[in-house]
Amino acid sequence: MIMADRLELCSALTVGGLTPYPELLRQIRTESDIPVRCLIRCRAGDFHYTPDEIELMAAQIRNLKSAGATGFVIGCLTPNGDLDTESMIPMIEAAEGAPLTLHRCIDVSRDLCKTWRDAKALGFDTVLTSGGASDCEKGMDAIGQLLYLRDTEGGPEILIGAGVNAKRISFFRTRFPGARAFHASAKTLIESKMLFRRDDVPMGLPGLDEWHVQQTDESSVRLCKEALNQ
């Protein structure tokens, strides 16, 4: 089986991802030794958090670290759209030196380059970004600027995400030969086995698809890896 180099583990992909369960991480650990960075996001919505939410996420980091997480994916913003470095300190301390990725809060921050530099100052080794756009192709110019910062100033790797597939990896690699890290859900939808369905009684947001389960597609992962290695 051709696997990814690293796994970002999260729950609730339909809302952009939330903190996963330690039990799920432990199950993964029994089956694979792939490095796992866990997303830490206690709720859906924006990335400005209360002190109680920060305390909760620091506790989630400690719990997941004890369950086998090798790194964490975190991020907080101030109301003005800057990286909230002060609020992130408790989470960074809870990680106890584990590698850190800044998640896509950068894409809704006021200044992507400033946010990248702030992440560098905090010790992050990776920044996940779509270039401040709804998908990576639309954010290509901004991603190019961030890759330039990485190469000229040294600092966090640029992990390109949002809409990544094998075709786009090849496209990015042609335009930016230095693009070397890509983040993809590589998901497919599995039809629910439920025969009796009540479409008029949603369990979540109205209109949310509740009759499919998202699952990683092995062939998509393989094609992405092949495109990266070309």
Walk through the language-model features, giving the residues of each.
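Catalytic cores of alpha/beta
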Residues: 1-2, 46-63, 107-122, 143-154, ...
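Catalytic domains of carbohydrate-active enzymes, especially glycoside hydrolases
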Residues: 1-14, 67-68
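A structural motif
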Residues: 4, 33, 68-69, 124, ...
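Hydrophobic faces of well-ordered beta-strands that scaffold small-molecule active sites
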Residues: 7-9, 36-40, 72-74, 100-104, ...
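Active-site-adjacent beta->alpha loops and helix N-cap segments on the catalytic face
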Residues: 13-34, 51-56, 76-96, 109-115, ...
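Ordered, amphipathic secondary-structure segments that act as subunit-interaction surfaces
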Residues: 59-75
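C-terminal alpha-helical cap/extension of soluble enzyme domains
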Residues: 68, 150, 154-230
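Ligand/cofactor pocket segment of small-molecule handling proteins
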Residues: 95, 99, 105-107, 117, ...
